[in-house]
From Swiss-Prot:
Signal peptide positions on this chain: none
NCBIfam families: S21p (TIGR00030)
Domain of life: Bacteria
UniProt record, GO biological process: translation
MF terms (GO), sorted A to Z: structural constituent of ribosome
Identification of the protein by name: Small ribosomal subunit protein bS21
Family per record: Belongs to the bacterial ribosomal protein bS21 family.
Length: 70
């Protein structure tokens, strides 16, 4: 359970922003969304492999020299 201490004279918007930031750092929302529906192990492996391939091609594309502009 994530808790934050609200300081004296601290606006609630700032406290809410700090709370959202801590939740985002811990990755609780992404974990919650992933567990919202059951995913078969085969489809999970397929999704992770596709993400790895996408990351690989993105890394390769960023390492290529830019095209000549003339």
């Amino acid at each position: 359970m994530t808790t934050i201490r609200v300081k004296e004279n601290e606006p609630y918007e700032v406290a809410l922003r700090r709370f959202k930031r801590t939740i985002e750092k811990l990755g609780l929302l992404t974990d919650l969304r992933a567990r919202e529906f059951y995913e078969k192990p085969t489809s999970e492996r397929k999704r992770k492999k596709a993400a790895a391939v996408k990351r690989h091609y993105k890394r390769v594309r960023s390492m290529q020299l830019p095209k000549k502009l003339y």
